[in-house]
């Protein structure tokens, strides 16, 4: 898929900006603070329903404005015969998000997220590796969400059961009142876990070759999965029953896929905790690129790839390795930098450049 039009209204420093990116390589340059990241942030908002730079109240809406709007028009479909144009709009009124997809209001933003797939690497992406389990669970679920049509319904089923069980636990409900939700949680949770495990196994096969190319010094060798309970010993139904008294005391559910995690393993390092910040960023980027490749294989089309401030996140050597790998893929890429990255210096006509300055985005001629 590739974005044909991105319109941004009243987001951070932008009053009104419209961008028509090319279907291949797009580089947005400008000084620090010019607004390059905000362009990718707008695209990320549409694809994820949230910003990677904080909450709405952290300055997402332009100062003095009451709302913000983002519009995206893109083509999707793995072949010319199946290609179609999609259009989506997202608005925050200052109180809540609302969205439209192909001319219809959407009841949930998940409909927008399911329609437009964007893989984003930004300065905070290292938390995928160095942070807690939540971003890693979200990473797995994003991949499943986009390649398995029924996954969202399964995930919602589990989350609903978890919320109901936790509410009963906080109320100090009698044990028999938990039985129905324990059954629902166990049934949906076992299926959810099996899906996650299969996906991670498949992702590992794609990740190791990617990591060997962009960061061979890491020696990334495997991904291991922790399901959120001792699955090799007991079923989830039994784990919930065994933990019931403790859960009633604590007021929350301690066992299940909402506690799951996964970890990378390395031949030359003792574990993810031994990684430097730069190594964590490289590992995270390798995971994201492997996920993009898996999406492309399963869906017969690439997601949009957004790389923010690559120059400050990676040294020139690793930038060149990453971009060399990406240039060979038929994916649309939007990259921000203060100058042309070393891996794109010879891109020639393949590279479409935009300059961001004073709240405006302008297409640059090849000779600029």
Swiss-Prot record:
Enumerate the PROSITE patterns for this protein: RECF_1 (PS00617), RECF_2 (PS00618)
Q: Which residues bind ATP?
A: 30-37
GO BP annotations of the record are: DNA replication; DNA synthesis involved in DNA repair; double-strand break repair; SOS response
Alphabetized, the UniProt keywords read: ATP-binding, Cytoplasm, DNA damage, DNA repair, DNA replication, DNA-binding, Nucleotide-binding, SOS response
Membrane-spanning residues where? none
| Subcellular localization(s) per the UniProt record | Cytoplasm
Q: What is its main location?
A: cytoplasm
Q: Name one GO molecular function term.
A: single-stranded DNA binding
Q: Name one GO cellular component term.
A: cytoplasm
Family the entry assigns: Belongs to the RecF family.
Give the protein's function. The RecF protein is involved in DNA metabolism; it is required for DNA replication and normal SOS inducibility. RecF binds preferentially to single-stranded, linear DNA. It also seems to bind ATP.
| HAMAP family, sorted | RecF
Task: State the name under which the record lists this protein.
Answer: DNA replication and repair protein RecF
């Amino acid at each position: 898929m590739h974005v044909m039009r991105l319109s941004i209204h009243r987001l951070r420093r932008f009053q009104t900006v419209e961008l028509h990116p090319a279907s291949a390589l797009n580089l947005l340059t400008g000084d620090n603070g010019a607004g390059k990241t905000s362009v990718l942030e707008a695209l990320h908002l549409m694809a994820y329903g949230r910003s990677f730079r904080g909450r709405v109240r952290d300055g997402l809406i332009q100062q003095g404005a009451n709302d913000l709007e983002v519009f995206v028009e893109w083509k999707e479909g793995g072949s010319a015969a199946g290609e179609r144009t999609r259009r989506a709009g997202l608005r925050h009124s200052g109180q809540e998000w609302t969205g439209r997809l192909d001319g219809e209001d959407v009841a949930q933003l998940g409909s927008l997220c399911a329609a437009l797939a964007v893989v984003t690497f930004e300065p905070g992406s290292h938390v995928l590796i160095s942070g807690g389990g939540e971003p890693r669970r979200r990473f797995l679920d994003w991949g499943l969400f986009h390649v398995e049509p029924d996954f969202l319904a399964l995930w919602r089923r589990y989350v609903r059961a978890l919320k109901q069980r936790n509410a009963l636990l906080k109320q100090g409900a009698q044990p028999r009142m938990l039985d129905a939700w324990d059954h629902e949680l166990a049934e949906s949770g076992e299926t959810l876990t099996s899906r996650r495990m299969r996906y991670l196994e498949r992702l590992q096969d794609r990740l190791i070759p990617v990591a060997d190319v962009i960061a061979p010094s890491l020696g990334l060798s495997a991904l291991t999965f922790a399901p959120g309970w001792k699955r090799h010993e007991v079923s989830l139904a039994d784990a919930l029953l065994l933990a019931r008294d403790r859960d009633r005391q604590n007021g929350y559910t301690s066992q299940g896929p909402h506690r799951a995690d996964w970890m990378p393993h390395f031949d030359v390092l003792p574990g993810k905790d031994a990684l430097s910040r730069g190594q964590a960023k490289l590992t995270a980027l390798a995971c994201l690129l492997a996920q993009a490749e898996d999406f492309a294989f399963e869906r017969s089309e690439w997601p949009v790839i957004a790389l923010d401030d690559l120059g400050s996140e990676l040294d020139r050597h690793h930038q060149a390795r990453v971009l060399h790998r990406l240039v060979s893929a038929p994916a649309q890429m939007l990259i921000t930098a203060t100058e042309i990255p070393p891996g794109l210096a010879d891109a020639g006509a393949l590279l479409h450049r935009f300059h961001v300055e004073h709240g405006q985005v302008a297409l640059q001629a090849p000779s600029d």
